[in-house]
């Protein structure tokens, strides 16, 4: 009953109707109509209603240009080649072509009556219809021209004709059958480069740019953000639009490749105009403590009669010091003057400053020199200053001499050397204002000093742009597009060849108008490299059609002399409209009036073709671009996407009467997708792993790793090592196996019973489960719990709960050490949980010990059937120290007051076992136990043969 109620509730829940699905059609409310624009192309005339096709011409279905001639009276078996000009099968041309049938035609005549009488008119059908005999008479039925047409695109049959539609990127030719490629590049859809292809085009970018995700725009490539291993500059990189500039660190300069840097020489002298070597060695004066005792440098002796240096002054050669010479001469002043004059010193007034003020006042300078006599006072030792080129310098002082010499004084000795300049850039600025070394703060390029960061063009190179950065100048030149150009370039840096047209062996400039192929009645125009030809437009005639005459060699009709008329005749059937009658000839865009001279004047509301695939609404004059698109005979709403008919891997979208197609975007959400044959995108079901197809859910091994097992799950591959179970202490790995195995020394009994040499229980390949089923090797750290109680058996679950409340707690005795008991030392105890309850597990708990031969499982009550004996399957270890009993499955009726066995699942392989220790149950509990056993297993079970009470007591 409970199961039936649950099943009914599930069925009702499944059959309950859900909320109605709300589909989104994608249609948007119609917006404003696009503003009409003036029609362009040949055969366009202006009227009071705007611009439109001239009389005798109609817009083509593909491009919308006025290139489709109209023959008002039909051409019959001929073809309309010009307004009201038919080309007949016999080679003649005229306003119409004669029928080949008799006066009444193939299907007889109809009697037509009007104002003056009746006449027989041949039964004919309009163009695009055929006469068909039906049960109710002869009817005109539409002809499916698509069956026999030579349309290169998609043919759509219409009432009385057909429409040949070309795919995206193609346009219908003037013959209304063939499709020609549309050069989309003429509309400049690409920002930089455009390459036309059949039915499509491809945008590309110049070097230094990459294509944007919209496939039209170009984005600057920041070359300076590349990874370290792919960097473009050796040292520093500065990104520019479409390019980059490289600079070098101080001490390096840019090589000719403008990318790598090279080190300057370790020492580069200042410019030659500043640092010129002297032709004579430098001399300097050293002060002496005594006056009148000059010291000369080696190789320089005072000339005869020349005065020596002033008192307390000595001379020395640079850079090595010169020892003081103990010689003197009465002509020291003359010698000093000649020596100073021979030395290249920039100042000419040195003689007035030879002696410092301290010497002129008679002071004694503390310089390291020996006294002249014993009467001389001893001077305190200390650092001696230096007298150099008329100036006194303290010891350990430094100064720069004119000529870029660096000098320093060290204890009375002056040392000078050339200033060494480090060239840290490629275009340094020469030193100014007495400086010695060039500067890298700015650039000196082509004789002009540029400030830091200046962008300039070299002389006579206006198309080259240079930039000054840290004394380095980097220049780039613009890239000029190759091939012809649509418009003249805006700068003088690039030149291109203008677009021309090649037609019948001659070249024509863009926009040129010429006659085509010697036919004076055909006018051709060169537009954007393509030639478009059409018949020469003819002036509108003021006479009715019956008065048109085409003379020999003429391209247009002329009017003959008018004849008096009382109305306007429209066709050969004699239908006339009175003067002043206004009517619509079946076209909602055209209104006609019968004028007094018998001519018909029609005014047409010309429609502007603002889109290639508008929706034509019946009864409406102009097609509608704002409502959606008409494509391949179907109507699509704005922003509606649909697969292309010509290529299933293209996805098209309708946008205000235009259809744009692009490749299908394939989102890949897995690592190993598989690309089925004939599909546009890979799918994440099967896997493509290392070039081979792996079915979903298939488990396979790797060729180079046979011990690795992999699984394909919805495009993802997960691999793991083959798990191995250690069944013995000393495993051995055999060649070709993934897992180790036990050696052959293991006894057959141990291998069969699943016991290791250490006495532990292990299920081997020969082991059996509790129910006798063959099981695979297992090694579980914890055993899973039994299945939970099924809600479809609430009565059984209630009985189990009532029975549990009447049971005692489990009495457990500690297990004796291994080998302390014999074969009968293992007893059963009372478990605390039932199968189906949380925490229940089919385990054996040791109970209180019983004497040998005493029955462990007593009868439930007098007269109750005896429980069948239970015979355990014993397994002996190698040492025989421990006995492990494996119990066969017990029948469900053995639920007595002493023991109970609850099994929720009747299947032998999944039966959890709960053994209860001996206890005297109450009558109510006994009856519940009996009812529970009967409910679980209604059928009686026979006890196994050969079981003894003694074997049962060992439990």
UniProtKB/Swiss-Prot annotation:
SUPFAM superfamilies: FnI-like domain (SSF57603), Growth factor receptor domain (SSF57184)
UniProt feature, compositional bias: Pro residues: 300-310
Keywords: Calcium, Disulfide bond, EGF-like domain, Glycoprotein, Repeat, Secreted, Signal
Domain EGF-like: 70-98, 142-180, 181-219, 220-262
Disulphide bond pairs: 146-155, 151-164, 166-179, 185-194, 190-203, 205-218, 224-237, 233-246, 248-261
InterPro entries: cEGF, EGF-like_Ca-bd_dom, EGF-like_dom, EGF-type_Asp/Asn_hydroxyl_site, EGF_Ca-bd_CS, Growth_fac_rcpt_cys_sf, vWF_C/EGF_Fibrillin, VWF_dom
Gene3D superfamilies linked to this entry: 6.20.200.20, Complement Module, domain 1, Laminin
Protein name: von Willebrand factor C and EGF domain-containing protein
């Amino acid at each position: 009953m409970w199961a039936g109620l649950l099943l009914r509730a599930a069925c009702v829940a499944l059959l309950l109707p859900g909320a109605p699905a709300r589909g989104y059609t994608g249609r948007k409310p119609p917006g404003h109509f696009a503003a009409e624009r003036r029609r362009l192309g040949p055969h366009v005339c202006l009227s009071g209603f705007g611009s439109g096709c001239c009389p005798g011409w109609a817009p083509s279905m593909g491009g919308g240009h006025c290139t489709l001639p109209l023959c008002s009276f039909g051409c019959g078996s001929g073809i309309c080649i010009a307004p009201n000009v038919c080309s007949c099968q016999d080679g003649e041309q005229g306003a119409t072509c004669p029928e080949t049938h008799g006066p009444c035609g193939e299907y007889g005549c109809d009697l037509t009556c009007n104002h003056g009488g009746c006449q027989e008119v041949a039964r004919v059908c309009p163009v695009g219809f055929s006469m068909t005999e039906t049960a109710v008479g002869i009817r005109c039925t539409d002809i499916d021209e698509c069956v026999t047409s030579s349309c290169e695109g998609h043919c759509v049959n219409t009432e009385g004709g057909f429409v040949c539609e070309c795919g995206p990127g193609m346009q219908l030719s003037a013959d209304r059958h063939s499709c020609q490629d549309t050069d989309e590049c003429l509309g400049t859809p690409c920002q930089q480069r455009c390459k036309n292809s059949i039915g499509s085009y491809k945008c590309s970018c110049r070097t230094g740019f990459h294509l944007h995700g919209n496939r039209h725009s170009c984005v600057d490539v920041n070359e300076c953000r590349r990874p370290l291993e792919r960097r473009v500059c050796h040292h520093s990189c500065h990104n520019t639009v479409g390019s980059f500039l490289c600079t070098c660190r101080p001490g390096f300069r840019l090589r000719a490749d403008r990318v790598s840097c090279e080190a300057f020489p370790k020492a580069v002298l200042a410019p030659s105009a500043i640092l010129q070597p002297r032709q004579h060695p430098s001399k300097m004066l050293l002060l002496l403590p005594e006056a009148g005792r000059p010291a000369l440098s080696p190789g320089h002796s005072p000339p005869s009669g020349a005065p020596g240096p002033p008192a307390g002054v000595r001379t020395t050669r640079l850079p090595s010091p010169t020892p003081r010479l103990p010689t003197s001469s009465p002509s020291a002043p003359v010698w000093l003057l000649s020596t100073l004059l021979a030395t290249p010193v920039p100042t000419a007034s040195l003689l007035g400053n030879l002696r410092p003020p301290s010497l002129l006042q008679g002071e004694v300078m503390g310089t390291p020199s020996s006294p002249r006599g014993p009467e001389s006072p001893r001077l305190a030792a200390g650092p001696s200053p230096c007298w150099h080129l008329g100036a006194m310098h303290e010891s350990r002082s430094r100064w720069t001499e004119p000529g870029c010499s660096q000098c320093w004084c060290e204890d009375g000795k002056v040392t000078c050397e050339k200033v060494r300049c480090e060239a840290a850039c490629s275009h340094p600025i020469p030193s100014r204002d007495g400086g010695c070394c060039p500067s890298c703060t700015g650039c000196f390029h082509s004789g002009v000093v540029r400030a830091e960061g200046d962008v300039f063009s070299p002389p006579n190179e206006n198309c080259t742009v240079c930039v000054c950065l840290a004394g380095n100048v980097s220049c780039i030149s613009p890239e000029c597009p190759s091939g012809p150009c649509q418009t003249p370039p805006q700068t003088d840096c690039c030149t291109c060849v203008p677009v021309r047209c090649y037609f019948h062996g001659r070249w024509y400039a863009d926009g040129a108008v010429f006659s085509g192929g010697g036919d004076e009645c055909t006018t051709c125009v060169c537009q954007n490299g393509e030639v478009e030809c059409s018949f020469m437009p003819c002036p509108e005639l003021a006479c009715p059609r019956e008065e048109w005459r085409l003379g020999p060699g003429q391209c247009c009709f002329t009017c003959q002399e008018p004849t008096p008329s009382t109305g306007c005749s429209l066709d050969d059937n004699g239908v006339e409209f009175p003067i002043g009658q206004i009517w619509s000839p079946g076209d909602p865009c055209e209104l006609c009036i019968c004028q007094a001279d018998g001519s018909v004047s029609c005014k047409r509301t010309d429609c502007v073709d603002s889109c290639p695939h508008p929706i034509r609404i019946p009864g409406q004059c102009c097609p509608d671009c704002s409502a959606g698109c008409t494509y391949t005979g179907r109507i699509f709403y704005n922003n509606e996407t649909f697969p292309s008919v010509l290529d299933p891997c293209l996805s098209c979208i309708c946008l205000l009467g235009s259809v744009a197609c692009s490749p299908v975007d394939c989102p890949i959400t897995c690592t190993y997708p598989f690309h089925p044959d004939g599909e546009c995108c890979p799918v994440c079901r099967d896997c493509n792993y290392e070039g081979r197809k792996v079915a979903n859910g298939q488990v396979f091994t790797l060729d180079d790793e046979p011990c690795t097992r992999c699984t394909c799950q919805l495009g993802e591959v997960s691999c793991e090592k083959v798990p191995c179970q250690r069944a013995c202490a000393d495993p051995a790995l055999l060649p070709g196996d993934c897992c180790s195995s036990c050696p052959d020394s293991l006894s057959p009994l141990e291998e069969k019973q699943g016991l290791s040499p250490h006495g532990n229980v292990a299920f081997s390949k020969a082991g059996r489960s509790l129910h006798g089923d063959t099981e695979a090797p297992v090694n579980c750290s914890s055993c899973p719990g039994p299945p939970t109680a099924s809600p479809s058996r609430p009565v059984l679950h209630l009985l189990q709960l009532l029975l549990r409340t009447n049971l005692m707690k489990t009495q457990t005795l500690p297990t004796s050490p291994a080998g302390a008991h014999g074969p009968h030392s293992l007893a059963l105890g009372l478990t605390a949980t039932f199968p189906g309850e949380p925490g229940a597990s089919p385990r054996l708990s040791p109970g209180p010990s019983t004497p040998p031969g005493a029955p462990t499982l007593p009868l439930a009550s007098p007269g109750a059937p005896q429980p069948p004996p239970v015979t355990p399957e014993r397994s002996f270890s190698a040492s025989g120290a421990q006995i492990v009993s494996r119990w066969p499955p017990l029948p469900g009726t053995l639920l007595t007051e002493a023991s109970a066995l609850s099994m929720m699942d009747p299947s032998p392989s999944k039966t959890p076992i709960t053994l209860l220790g001996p206890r005297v149950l109450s009558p109510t509990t006994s009856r519940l136990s009996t009812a529970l056993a009967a409910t679980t297993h209604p059928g009686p079970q026979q006890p196994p043969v050969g079981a003894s009470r003694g074997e049962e007591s060992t439990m």
